Regions:
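Switch/connector loops and helix/strand junctions flanking conserved nucleotide-binding motifs
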Residues: 6-7, 32-33, 60, 88-93, ...
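Conserved P-loop NTPase motor "coupling/switch" region that bridges the ATPase
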Residues: 7, 48-49, 66-156
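Residue-level preference for the first positions of well-ordered beta-strands
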Residues: 20-22, 49, 79, 169
Length: 186
C-alpha cells in the first residue's frame, strides 16, 4: 500500500505541462499490459520524443511488442530509432523500424508489399506444411537510397578512438514511488 502523498507524486508524472519529462523503459516492458498502459498514459500526458534503442528488437511485424511500440509511437510528437547492428543482415527487418518512425517513410501499405519489392520468396515444404522463405533480396540499391533520406549512419572507425569497455555494476536504490512504478510494470 502507498500513502496519499506517494500516490500524489505518482499522479504528478502525468500532469500536462511544458517541462521536459524523461521516462526510460526497457523495451521488454512493452510486451506487458501494465508496461503498455503506463507508457501510454505518460505519452498522452506530455509532448514527447520516443526513442527505441537497439531498434532491431521491433523488427518482427507480427510480434506483440512491435505492434504495441508502433501503436504507442503515434502518441509521441517525435520518434527516433538507434541500433549498433548493421542493417545488411536482413533488409526486411527495416520495415517495422521505419513504420515506427512514420508509416509513410517507405511508401508501402503493408509489410507484404514491402517484402515483395525487396525479396524474392520461395515456398518450402516442411513436415506437411508450406512456408514462404526469402530466396534472395532485390532492389537493395533503391532501398539504400530511400533510407539515406531519413537516416544517419556512423561507423565505429569514423568515431574518435574509443577506450576499452569498462563494465561497472551499479546498484541503485529506488525511492518508494519509483519502486511502486517498477513493481507495477513487472
Amino acid at each position: 500500500n502507498i500513502t496519499k502523498s506517494q500516490q500524489e507524486k505518482l499522479e504528478s508524472l502525468f500532469e500536462i505541462e511544458t517541462a521536459l519529462h524523461i521516462l526510460i523503459m526497457n523495451v521488454e516492458a512493452f510486451s506487458t499490459e501494465k508496461g503498455v498502459k503506463f507508457a501510454s498514459k505518460f505519452l498522452n500526458s506530455h509532448k514527447t520524443l520516443m526513442a527505441i534503442d537497439e531498434s532491431t528488437t521491433i523488427k518482427n511485424p507480427t510480434a506483440k511488442r512491435t505492434k504495441s511500440i508502433i501503436s504507442l509511437g503515434k502518441h509521441s510528437k517525435y520518434r527516433r530509432i538507434m541500433t549498433g547492428s548493421p542493417v545488411t543482415k536482413n533488409p526486411l527487418d527495416l520495415y517495422t523500424q521505419c513504420k515506427f518512425l512514420d508509416s509513410y517513410l517507405l511508401d508501402f501499405t503493408s509489410y507484404y508489399a514491402f517484402r515483395n519489392r525487396y525479396a524474392e520468396m520461395k515456398t518450402m515444404h516442411l513436415r506437411g506444411r508450406s512456408i514462404q522463405v526469402v530466396d534472395e533480396f532485390k532492389n537493395l540499391a533503391e532501398l539504400s537510397e530511400t533510407l539515406k533520406g531519413f537516416s544517419y549512419r556512423v561507423l565505429k572507425e569514423d568515431c574518435l578512438d574509443l577506450p576499452p569497455k569498462n563494465w561497472t555494476k551499479r546498484h541503485i536504490t529506488l525511492s518508494k514511488e519509483q519502486q511502486k512504478v517498477y513493481d507495477e510494470m513487472k
